[in-house]
């Protein structure tokens, strides 16, 4: 399987008509993929192709659509190592983690089929001499925007349920990960998906703006930053005829009540803050620990563990815990964010540094910002802020001091503490003695506040990929025995 380095419109691979762009490996510097972006006209052609393909695809039985999706899963199995290598190269993540991402893509098919039947599907019951029937119908043409941190798994979590429901799709991946999208779309064609049911438009913000501005899409499914999600929300303002599903970021708190097992607590913090190099939307960004010996001892142990954490190139042996960020520019932004926190009074406990010039490899950063005036921003990388608290109420207040509400975690405490935390914390994913990045594949995924609205790319994705239709129906038209008051026939 080789990348086409083109757009996919109505079943045909075509060159873009706009500016040329390229994707380079953020660690090695190798050019991985280069092509021309889609023009606004080509975006409209892709939408038109999806619109034309939609009726026939929607009329097919669910079993027929499921068969195509299951063949797609088989294609992923066949090409899993090639896809994993591409993901590792594009994102900078370790090969072992890229392999787990492809595994998640494969697993998403069975999960989405189950979710379709449980969350949507069809229900019926008798009511007198009629039947009440609940059905679900696809919206039509859905635009799917993919993020760069999980370029296979997260868009897949939109696309698979959208296609199962009978929608047609126009997919706009991140310009940071065009190759993964290219290869994934080849798998859809290999699976026998009809021409036009899925289309691929490559490029940067201009392509995304053109797609979001198309009058002929019926909805947009987005996973990405709160900034871009907010722009889309404003752009869609007043368009009540369109579904907009947003899964955005978070400034996620991890609260330490006490430390029953220091090594276990340190590991949970490392996995919460630095998994994928901090490039997960559920990563802990704020570590909230008590003043005094409990907090001091934990921070000392954490600092020591950070110093030993292996960070290296994606294909290194022995394998690293995490590797590079998705781009050198992203690494530059993280280093600038650290400098800003220091300028605001933050005290570095473990300073984040670039490990190799010209690359996106960064060491983990840990900075104490207790009492500092710091922005409520998601620093999307290996940078963890420490806040100290004096009592439980202050810990909860610090945890909730954010406009976001994606994930939160509690380490230690008794059942009563957990119950109180669960009641008072504002987040869509709340974990106890497990990392904040841990989530069940058959549970909703998403948050409140500026972290989004629906629960995109997870079990509840079926909810926004189809709309319910309620019917009262009978085989024959029958005159009732008793007429309504005031009616004479």
Curated annotation (Swiss-Prot):
EC numbers for this chain: 1.2.1.71
Keyword entries, A-Z: Arginine metabolism, NAD, Oxidoreductase
Biological-process GO terms, alphabetical: arginine catabolic process to glutamate; arginine catabolic process to succinate
Molecular-function annotations in GO: succinylglutamate-semialdehyde dehydrogenase activity
Catalysed transformations (reactions): N-succinyl-L-glutamate 5-semialdehyde + NAD(+) + H2O = N-succinyl-L-glutamate + NADH + 2 H(+)
Residue positions of the active site: 247, 281
InterPro entries: Ald_DH/histidinol_DH, Ald_DH_C, Ald_DH_CS_CYS, Ald_DH_CS_GLU, Ald_DH_N, Aldehyde_DH_dom, Aldehyde_DH_Superfamily, SuccinylGlu_semiald_DH_AstD
Domain of life: Bacteria
SUPFAM superfamilies cross-referenced by the UniProt entry: ALDH-like
Biological or metabolic pathway of the protein: Amino-acid degradation; L-arginine degradation via AST pathway; L-glutamate and succinate from L-arginine: step 4/5
Functional note: Catalyzes the NAD-dependent reduction of succinylglutamate semialdehyde into succinylglutamate.
Name of this protein: N-succinylglutamate 5-semialdehyde dehydrogenase
């Amino acid at each position: 399987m080789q990348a086409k380095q083109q757009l996919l419109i109505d079943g045909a691979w075509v060159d873009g008509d706009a500016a040329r762009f390229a994707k380079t490996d953020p660690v090695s510097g190798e050019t991985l993929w280069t092509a021309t972006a889609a023009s606004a006209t080509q975006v409209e052609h892709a939408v038109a192709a999806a619109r034309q393909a939609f009726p026939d695809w929607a009329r097919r039985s669910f079993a027929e659509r499921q068969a195509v999706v299951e063949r797609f899963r088989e294609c992923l199995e066949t090409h899993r190592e090639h896809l994993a290598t591409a993901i590792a190269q594009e994102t900078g993540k370790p090969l072992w983690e890229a392999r787990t991402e492809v595994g998640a893509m494969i697993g998403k098919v069975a999960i989405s089929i189950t979710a379709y039947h449980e969350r949507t599907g069809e229900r019926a019951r008798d009511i007198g001499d009629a039947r009440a029937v609940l059905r679900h119908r696809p919206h039509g043409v859905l635009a799917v925007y993919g993020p760069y941190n999980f370029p296979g798994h997260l868009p897949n979590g939109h696309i698979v349920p959208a296609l199962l429901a009978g929608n047609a799709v126009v997919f706009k991946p991140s310009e940071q990960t065009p190759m993964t999208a290219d290869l994934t779309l080849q798998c859809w064609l290999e699976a026998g998906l009809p021409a036009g049911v899925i289309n691929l438009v490559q490029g940067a913000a201009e392509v995304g703006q053109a797609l979001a501005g198309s009058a002929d899409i019926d909805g947009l499914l987005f996973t990405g930053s709160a900034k871009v999600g907010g722009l889309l929300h404003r752009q869609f303002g007043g368009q009540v005829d369109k579904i907009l599903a947003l899964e955005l970021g978070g400034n996620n708190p991890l609260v330490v009540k006490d430390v029953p097992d220091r090594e276990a607590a340190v590991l949970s913090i490392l996995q919460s803050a630095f998994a994928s190099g901090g490039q997960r939307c559920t990563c802990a960004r704020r570590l909230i620990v008590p003043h005094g010996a409990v907090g001091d001892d934990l921070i000392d142990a954490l600092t020591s563990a950070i110093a030993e954490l292996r960070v290296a190139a994606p294909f290194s042996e022995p394998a690293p815990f995490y590797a590079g960020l998705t781009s050198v520019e992203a690494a530059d932004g993280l280093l600038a964010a650290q400098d800003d926190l220091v300028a605001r009074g933050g005290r570095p406990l473990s300073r984040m540094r670039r490990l190799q010039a010209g690359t996106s490899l960064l060491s983990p950063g840990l900075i104490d910002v207790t009492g500092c005036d710091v922005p409520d921003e998601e620093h999307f990388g290996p940078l963890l802020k420490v806040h100290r608290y004096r009592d439980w109420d202050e810990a909860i207040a610090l945890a909730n001091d954010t406009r976001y509400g994606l994930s939160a975690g509690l380490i230690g405490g008794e059942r009563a503490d957990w119950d109180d935390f669960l009641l008072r914390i504002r987040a869509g994913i709340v974990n106890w003695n497990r990392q904040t990045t841990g989530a069940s594949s058959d549970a909703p995924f998403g948050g409140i506040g500026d972290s989004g609205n629906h629960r995109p790319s997870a079990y509840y994705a079926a909810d926004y990929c189809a709309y319910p239709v309620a019917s009262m129906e009978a085989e024959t038209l029958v005159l009732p025995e008793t007429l309504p008051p005031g009616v004479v026939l």
